[in-house]
Amino acid sequence: MCDEEVAALVVDNGSGMCKAGFAGDDAPRAIFPSIVGRPRHQGVMVGMGQKDSYVGDEAQSKRGILTLKYPIEHGIVTNWDDMEKIWHHTFYNELRVAPEEHPVLLTEAPLNPKANREKMTQIMFETFNTPAMYVAIQAVLSLYASGRTTGIVMDTGDGVTHTVPIYEGYALPHAILRLDLAGRDLTDYLMKILTERGYSFTTTAEREIVRDIKEKLCYVALDFEQEMATAASSSSLEKSYELPDGQVITIGNERFRCPEALFQPAFLGMESPGIHETTYNSIMKCDIDIRKDLYANTVLSGGTSMYPGIADRMQKEITSLAPSTMKIKIIAPPERKYSVWIGGSILASLSTFQQMWISKQEYDESGPSIVHRKCF
């Protein structure tokens, strides 16, 4: 790109990972954990250059001596001071850009509280002095990335899962459903069921090890009961994992019991429908005339949709809920882990989008509430 100096920045702040890069690129340049870590102990070595806080990968690598906090919970920012640190780290350390020289596209969870949106806008203009910014809904960007304008997106990340029906580019707010069950809950559940096997994982640092086990070894069973029977009768499903200290642990039915909670939240003690039923309920809240288009364009997105077997299982479950003649298509693009970011990159580089940005001037005239008028 020759005009790199005016490229818009696209920042997808997820509960678990932050994805950032330049509009027009086909993948984010920076991907790091949305973590701020603070030392657990008092420093005793002088001149070590110890900091009072660490962000992202650096916090991850020093996790043994830090207390790790995630400023975004269930897709919504709960700690603004830490969030500011993450944005600062994104601009200055990861992308190495001056935010006052680039428009910034941020993403937000559907049904985000209005005050949250305003606060994001305020920080961008007042702390980072961006010339222009925009806030886009994550699921809508995933649909853009799949090349569609109509469909239902089941977006499931680390902190929250949403089903968002979109028709001709418009999200249908009355039919958006939110499920507070996502990757972080699955990590916690895996910690719990591994403890039942006699392995102990308790600290915030150990949780990160379990997250790695989950990402490398878990999968979704097509038929849970049958898979349980197979696991009980043979060791064909067992896998081993080497912990950082060299100890090797074996994991069997936990591999599919963990993500099964997405389809059976009762496993986590939650009284709520699974992701398949939530998707179906969301479709049923839409006008009868557009349901057919939604069934045929069901798009999976987000890191928690990366389990092998999840698309086939969704197909099976939704087929059993929907009318028998209905054509159902589950779209699970291979790059779905980053499809929100990719959609943002596409959107921010469209020529028709350029008049959509909120400029510093508009912000100065109207204040943070401008975001509700300009960003849907």
Curated annotation (Swiss-Prot):
Q: Quickly give the catalysed reaction.
A: ATP + H2O = ADP + phosphate + H(+)
MF terms per GO, please? ATP binding; hydrolase activity
Write the record's keywords in alphabetical order, separated by commas.
Acetylation, ATP-binding, Cytoplasm, Cytoskeleton, Hydrolase, Nucleotide-binding
Q: Which residues form the propeptide?
A: 1-2
Give the N-acetylaspartate positions (modified residues).
D3
Cellular-component GO terms for this entry: cytoplasm; cytoskeleton
Write the Enzyme Commission number(s) for this entry.
3.6.4.-
Compartment(s) = Cytoplasm, Cytoskeleton
Coiled-coil region list: none
Role according to the record: Actins are highly conserved proteins that are involved in various types of cell motility and are ubiquitously expressed in all eukaryotic cells.
**Family under the similarity heading:** Belongs to the actin family.
What is the official name of this protein in its record?
Actin-1
Q: Which organism is it from?
A: Saccoglossus kowalevskii
